[in-house]
């Protein structure tokens, strides 16, 4: 999930990760503020930060707070905005969306010590606290209510163990590298991610909100034969499942094929197949997701173009007839780095919700068609400061459309403005 995105430096880092020069969860995601502080805690002739780094570990995180205002008027009989399941603003208040703290040991495929030894171990422990936690709880780690993703918002701010996994990698010489990941991890699917620092906007696409899982628990293998190809394959307990399972021990196949022929192009196809419906292992749910990223050589490589296509099928998704349902989403992104202070981005999206299965704003069995247009900027006020460059704000304006009158105050459209502030450490 989320390997093909953002400004040129991050997009290039993603391409390097796909090429196998570093692992996808490598230390390129980290920020200096927390480690800088740990380096100032001395223990004898060394420091806490130095000892952590010497062991190959890194500690980092971020804080995000934001506000969304529905310009179409407050939704009737609701404190949330339609089409905003993830990150919706409860009661139109400024909210602490996420506090994230991560302890990770990345595996670097280009590390001479790893190549000489032929293997290495790593992992990640990632905790989340804030308003967003209630939307991403996995089944079995939902401490606040009976089942995952029921968005009860009680209490308003919650804790979630977002990722808990171990990794082991083997260098195969000229055949490349092979890594195994075991535990709970964010899904491969999706251009957008739970981590707001990897996204263009504060708000999320409809495909991210409704068309794919957030996390999965199981075993995932990653094979990198060369600098252009990466293959993923594994089995999980299913969409947003962890210690508990919503069906009789059903397993889901999760896979990806990624191809990066150059620093300008990145192609990937994600696949999820398996039983996801409550209480049954039949029929299956299938999602196929082609992702394309292009960084044209014009404009000094400051322009990033992305296409994210989601095609889904569930064999019993029609609540009215008990039959199948399909969904389709197409999200296009354009992001341009104007200078070190400012990045401008656009998102255009269409989403087809067959039989009302994924979004559910229509009457059960009734298909809905939706769209959103989002424009925003990322403002980094202190780009030259070692610590200040990690702070930025992202104002945006978003227009949502629906072919049924199911949006704010029973309308076919709604307009919202929003802004969030993020500090990474």
Indicate residue ranges for each PLM-predicted region.
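N-terminal periplasmic/intermembrane-space "pro-region" immediately following the signal or transit peptide
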Residues: 1-78, 84, 111, 116, ...
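Outer-membrane beta-barrel pore domains
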Residues: 27-29, 34, 85-88, 133-136, ...
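Short loop/turn motifs that connect adjacent beta-strands in outer-membrane beta-barrel proteins
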Residues: 41-59, 72, 107-121, 171-178, ...
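Outer-envelope exported proteins of Gram-negative bacteria
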Residues: 56-64, 120-128, 179-183, 234, ...
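Residues on the lipid-exposed face of transmembrane beta-strands in outer-membrane beta-barrel proteins
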Residues: 61, 96-105, 163-168, 182, ...
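Surface-exposed coil loops of outer-membrane beta-barrel proteins
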Residues: 71-91, 134-258, 268-275, 365
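Glycine- and aromatic-enriched membrane insertion/assembly motifs of diderm outer-membrane
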Residues: 86-131, 332-344, 351-353
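Surface-exposed extracellular loop regions of Gram-negative outer-membrane beta-barrel proteins
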Residues: 103-132, 222-233, 291-298, 302-313
